[in-house]
């Protein structure tokens, strides 16, 4: 299961700072969704070998009538769906009446809750902790989110608590050969995601259609996902339900139509993601945010432009030009123009899904990767940094889904972004990787003398003189 952690608290206590620390915002994509999840932030995070999802629920205020939660209905639902609550408070201001009201609200949820006392620098934390012991809703952890102090201890306690409560977790540590064989034998898990009313459920029904073998609810690793097994062209797949796959008669709550939390879970649990766009609406900023989340997760993906029927040639050409411009940064992705309603061009989607899955899980030898690296260097030498040319020595395979290439060399981590991008593109084209992101990691050998103190000059002369060694 991918645990969900919700950050809750009144405004200006440092929730966003903690969110950025947990998600490593410089690397991870943070999506700000408009409309359904306006002003809320969702992000992927990782601690040790465990992945989790973080939700910044925004500020909770208080009115004359008591607790007034100034967040939209879907954010409340996200809090209720969370596995763990981080109740963030301010060490400088201490316990406030708003904190007491929020604690009263959280106590009703009966979720594992951790009190996070932020901004502890220069504060007598013992006195502050005594104030918050009174609300008695969970363990207390003092942190400095801006500096990152105390966060590792906090996360260790969180995951220890989850394990002790027998909650299954998704662990990235594995035995390479065993997991790779299992991956090849398992059905391809296919998540269908997209904005509302783009035709996700119509596409799913078109997939199932005559080829549907059995439909049942298979309890998955994410609490609210429905898994629908199917077979197409003798290949097994599992469609991951993201609310749009349910029958319309069963959807009574607007939150079920598009839950960002469920979408994030579906992406994490899938092997390949189908991002569905509406040909009539083009690609929106929300579509691009969702695409960024998919890329950030490292999942293979295929883009499907639905409702392609009944469009003029001029309109189709215009849409293709717009997509080519706005999606130029993902020239490795397959794009299909279909009509889910009439089943037009559906079969080609599965060809691209299989290709993307194969590319994301393929194994590559160290010899081949090193050979490609040397060819890339020969065609375009690494730059000179601080008077020395970067020397890249060898490359090896670092993982799959997404494919990871680890390059070793002196000053490798100091390479400019432009050269790193060149190497990434070179490996992609050389290995013919389509439909999946590829990640390049750079390692350089540790300096064995970095922690050795130099010998004072006088002592050095004395030692050498005892050995009858002349110093020039």
From Swiss-Prot:
Residue ranges occupied by any KH-like domain in the UniProt entry: 362-446
GO biological process: ribosome biogenesis
InterPro entries: G_ENGA, GTP-bd, GTPase_Der, KH_dom-like, KH_dom-like_a/b, P-loop_NTPase, Small_GTP-bd
UniProt keyword annotations, A-Z: GTP-binding, Nucleotide-binding, Repeat, Ribosome biogenesis
Chain residues that bind GTP 2: 194-201, 241-245, 306-309
Molecular function (Gene Ontology), one example: ribosome binding
Residues engaged in binding GTP 1: 9-16, 56-60, 118-121
Pfam families according to UniProt: KH_dom-like (PF14714), MMR_HSR1 (PF01926)
Disulfide cysteine pairs (residue numbers): none
Ubl conjugation is among the record's keywords: no
Family the entry assigns: Belongs to the TRAFAC class TrmE-Era-EngA-EngB-Septin-like GTPase superfamily. EngA (Der) GTPase family.
Quaternary organization: Associates with the 50S ribosomal subunit.
Database matches in HAMAP family: GTPase_Der
Chain's role: GTPase that plays an essential role in the late steps of ribosome biogenesis.
Designated name of the protein: GTPase Der
Native organism: Baumannia cicadellinicola subsp. Homalodisca coagulata
Gene designation: der
